[in-house]
Amino acid sequence: MNKAELLNNTEFKNAKCDLPIIYIASDDDVVKVGSIVNAPMVGRIYFSEVKKTITKDELLSNKEFICASEDSEILIDFVGYRRETLDCYVTVDDSCINIIEL
C-alpha cells in the first residue's frame, strides 16, 4: 500500500480523526502503527512499532508523511524488520482504523 492508496481509500477518508491505526498481518499478528514516522528514502515511509499508536489526525499532520511523495510505499517496522504493506484493505470500527494485509 502506498500513501495515495491510503489517502484515497473511502474507509480511511470517512474514519474519525481520533481513531488509532492498527496493522493486521496475514498471519494475524496485530501491530500498532507506531507514532514515529520516517521517510529517509525517496519512495518509502516507515512506521516504527512503538507502544503509542498514531491516530489518523496525527498522521495527516505529520511533517514526514506530508513531505513524502504520493507513490511512497508504506512499511511497518517490526523491531528492526521492515514489513512491506503490499496488498491491503482498510476497515474501520468504533475503536480503530484497521489496515489488513491480504
Report the location of each language-model feature.
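Short, intrinsically disordered N-terminal pre-domain segments
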Residues: 1-5
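Detector for the mature cores of small, proteolytically processed
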Residues: 12-102
